[in-house]
Amino acid sequence: MSQRGNRKTQVGIVVSDKMDKTVVVQVSHLVKHPVYNKYIKRSVKYKAHDEENSCKSGDRVQIVETRPLSKDKRWRVRQIIDRFE
């Protein structure tokens, strides 16, 4: 039996929860500019599967890589770290 490899995880903020069982999570990170040595904030948006529709906009969540669930969804919500108040 082969074991499943380590899956990638990301932490981000839910920016949209308008779809059924799907949330859009924005993951931000800092990148150093090669010439000016200044750190620039870059962000990527991922569509993630939320089975119970428990995530709301503004929540901080951890997402984990999974098999393709649809055309755009390749991530699944593992846990809600902080609720937005």
Swiss-Prot record:
InterPro entries per UniProt: NA-bd_OB-fold, Ribosomal_uS17, Ribosomal_uS17_bact/chlr, Ribosomal_uS17_CS
Gene Ontology molecular functions: rRNA binding; structural constituent of ribosome
Gene Ontology terms: biological process: translation
Keyword rRNA-binding in annotation: yes
Keywords: Ribonucleoprotein, Ribosomal protein, RNA-binding, rRNA-binding
Gene3D superfamilies xref list: Nucleic acid-binding proteins (2.40.50.140)
Keyword Zinc belongs to the record: no
GO CC terms, sorted: cytosolic small ribosomal subunit
Record HAMAP family: Ribosomal_uS17_B (MF_01345_B)
Protein family according to the UniProt entry: Belongs to the universal ribosomal protein uS17 family.
Subunit composition and interactions: Part of the 30S ribosomal subunit.
PANTHER family noted in UniProt: 40S RIBOSOMAL PROTEIN S11 FAMILY MEMBER (PTHR10744), SMALL RIBOSOMAL SUBUNIT PROTEIN US17M (PTHR10744:SF1)
Entry-linked NCBIfam families: PRK05610.1, uS17_bact
Function of the protein: One of the primary rRNA binding proteins, it binds specifically to the 5'-end of 16S ribosomal RNA.
Protein name stated in the entry: Small ribosomal subunit protein uS17
Organism: Geobacter metallireducens (strain ATCC 53774 / DSM 7210 / GS-15)
